[in-house]
Amino acid sequence: MLALEVALLSDRGGRNYNEDACGHWHSDRHLCCVLADGAGGHGGGDIASKVAVQELIGRFSRQPSPDGAALGLLLRETNVALIAQRVPGTPREDMHSTAVCLVIDFIAHAAHWAHAGDSRLYWLRDGRVHRRTRDHSLVQALVDAGVMSEADMQGHPQRSELRSALGIPPEQLVVTDTDGDDTVQPGDVFLLCTDGLWEYVTDPTLEQTLAASSTPRAWLDALAATVTEAASHKTSHDNFSALVVWTRTA
């Protein structure tokens, strides 16, 4: 069995309000973590991200289905629920949200996830980035096509142009989920984060700050300090949020 340690961070950055949300739930077998980044302004985006987190955790907790395809279906159901909460003539009329959901079965040592948008999941093993999700965005498509490099994504003027997010018509929603062997080893680390964080944090920085941190909270503090320093020239830099899970042998 795995022992898990979870820590969360959500900071409004240079904005007047926070459109990010994150949360987690656990049973005697599963840990479910969700992080979301809303869009639509105050009274819209902040509501959308909270709805995404609450719906995903609520649906999973009522009927745990720990595989990638089932999590993908939960995101699609949450999309319908989010659309149903729109209110014409208010900021909620056009609210959207990214979402990334991670489930760890700590008895079977298995991890599965699904996402829509550009909020990311990083899986680190032996102190190195082992895997990460691919964004549903214009710049990710350019990287995948060989037009630009991964390094060029950070700070790109069209970085926030998404190709999928909760709140769009169901037939247009693109959700990516895991398949195959996703066995967790003791010592593996998972990071869920919004673009307000990964915009300023490179893979080497993730690895270096992790190596220098003795606890999940210390790592989050180091990542937050990195973002704050790197974004100091932007008076209105984006909200940034992260949720981390450290694993070890129980």
Model-identified regions with their sequence ranges:
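PP2C/PPM-type serine/threonine phosphatase catalytic domain
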Residues: 1-250
